[in-house]
């Protein structure tokens, strides 16, 4: 086998990945999706949340939850019924084993630095 036949696919892959990384603001077909676009995994969305309303609905990219909004803690599944909190907020939730397995541990976004009572 010729060395050219081995190196060509590697060079093409590096070129494709390099061009993709060099144009981060461009709208993507699979990654870098805007809010409202169909998604399969949270990693595809600019916002960091692939949201679905029910178990049979199509998931779409959505903004992260703001303070006092309902949220899901970060998990290993690709989609959320409620988006995780924005940066600087935490999702206060009572976790359970069943809730972790069935993705039904929900809470509300809170600012831990907020000192008002």
UniProtKB/Swiss-Prot annotation:
GO terms for cellular component: extracellular region. Colipase is a cofactor of pancreatic lipase. It allows the lipase to anchor itself to the lipid-water interface. Without colipase the enzyme is washed off by bile salts, which have an inhibitory effect on the lipase. Gene3D superfamilies: Lipase, subunit A. Keywords: Digestion, Disulfide bond, Lipid degradation, Lipid metabolism, Secreted, Signal. It comes from the Eukaryota. It holds the Pfam family Colipase_C. Disulfide bonds join 39-50, 45-61, 49-83, 71-91, 85-109. It comes from Xenopus tropicalis (Western clawed frog). Forms a 1:1 stoichiometric complex with pancreatic lipase. GO terms for biological process: digestion; lipid catabolic process. GO terms for molecular function: enzyme activator activity; lipase binding. The gene is clps. Residues 1-22 form the signal peptide. InterPro entries: CLPS_chr, Colipase, Colipase_C, Colipase_CS, Colipase_N. It is found in: Secreted. This is Colipase. Belongs to the colipase family. The keyword Acetylation does not apply. Its main location: secreted. SMART domains: COLIPASE.
């Amino acid at each position: 086998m010729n060395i050219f036949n081995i190196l060509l696919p590697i060079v093409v892959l590096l070129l494709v990945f390099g061009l993709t990384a060099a144009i981060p603001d461009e709208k993507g077909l699979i990654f870098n999706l805007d809010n409202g676009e169909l998604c399969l995994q949270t990693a595809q969305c600019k916002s960091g949340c692939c949201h679905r309303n029910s178990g049979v609905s199509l998931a779409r990219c959505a903004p992260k939850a703001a303070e006092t909004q309902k949220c899901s803690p970060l998990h290993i599944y690709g989609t959320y019924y409620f988006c995780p909190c924005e940066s600087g907020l935490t999702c206060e939730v009572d976790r359970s084993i069943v809730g972790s397995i069935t993705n039904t541990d929900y809470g509300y976004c809170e600012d831990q630095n907020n000192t008002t009572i």
